[in-house]
């Protein structure tokens, strides 16, 4: 089971939290679709800003958005000009008051989405699929990853028959629920068609904190 399921979804509620932190009864469907529009809009607007993921919180008529990015300067802009433009566009998109918080990702080479998108971008520039995977693995291990696995699938090198090739280093314990495993997939549009990129990065175990109030202590 651990080999097939999305490692992030499997660990939600155990060592990972939801990326949408709100609850609604009647308006759930409309708010969910609004979330999807917000995420798609941010992805399109900040395509070059190395955005890893977006967290959304709601309170009354206010939306708090946390953007995790490897290039915070590009998101904020000179004197906050770019983030102000983004905030105004999101205000118009949602008809609500939007607050944006930009969080910098310091180690971009052990963030699965940024690694996957970097591999996809290099594949679009006709780089060797073997070399880009090995370079990504090397950089991640140097930054302290416990293990990494990458896979590229499709018409590799323009071959007539599609196939998948994967490389790994270290351990990636997909069945261990306390293992902090980051996963992402990306697509590369090449002249021979689409190539799929998958990345799993194991960053160590997240140990549960002991509850000191147990046993009447």
From Swiss-Prot:
It holds the Pfam family Ribosomal_S3_C. One of its GO terms (molecular function) is structural constituent of ribosome. InterPro entries: KH_dom, KH_dom-like_a/b, KH_dom_type_2, KH_sf_prok-type, Ribosomal_S3_C_sf, Ribosomal_uS3_bac-typ, Ribosomal_uS3_C, Ribosomal_uS3_CS. One of its GO terms (biological process) is translation. It comes from the Bacteria. Keywords: Ribonucleoprotein, Ribosomal protein, RNA-binding, rRNA-binding. Residues 38-106 form the KH type-2 domain. GO terms for cellular component: cytosolic small ribosomal subunit. Gene3D superfamilies: 3.30.300.20, Ribosomal protein S3, C-terminal domain. SMART domains: KH. Part of the 30S ribosomal subunit. Forms a tight complex with proteins S10 and S14. Binds the lower part of the 30S subunit head. Binds mRNA in the 70S ribosome, positioning it for translation. Belongs to the universal ribosomal protein uS3 family. This is Small ribosomal subunit protein uS3. It comes from Staphylococcus haemolyticus (strain JCSC1435). The gene is rpsC.
């Amino acid at each position: 089971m651990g080999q097939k399921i999305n490692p992030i979804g499997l660990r939600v509620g155990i060592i990972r939290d939801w990326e949408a932190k709100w609850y609604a009864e009647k308006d759930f469907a409309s708010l969910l679709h609004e979330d999807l529009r917000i995420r798609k809009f941010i992805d399109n607007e900040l395509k070059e800003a190395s955005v890893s993921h977006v967290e959304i919180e709601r309170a009354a008529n206010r939306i708090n958005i946390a953007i995790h990015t490897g290039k915070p300067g590009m998101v904020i802009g000179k004197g906050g000009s770019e983030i102000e433009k983004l905030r105004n566009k999101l205000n118009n998109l949602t008809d609500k008051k939007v607050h944006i918080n930009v969080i910098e990702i310091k180690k971009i080479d052990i963030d699965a989405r940024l690694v996957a998108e970097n591999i996809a971008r290099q594949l679009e520039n006709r780089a060797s699929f073997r070399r880009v995977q090995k370079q990504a693995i090397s950089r991640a291990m140097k930054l302290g990853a416990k293990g990494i696995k990458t896979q590229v699938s499709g018409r590799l090198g323009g071959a007539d028959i599609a196939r998948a090739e994967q490389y790994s280093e270290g351990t990636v314990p997909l069945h261990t629920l306390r293992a902090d495993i980051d996963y992402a997939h990306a697509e590369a549009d090449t002249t021979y068609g689409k190539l799929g990129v998958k990345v799993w990065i194991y960053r160590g175990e997240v140990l549960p904190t002991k509850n000191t109030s147990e046993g009447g202590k």
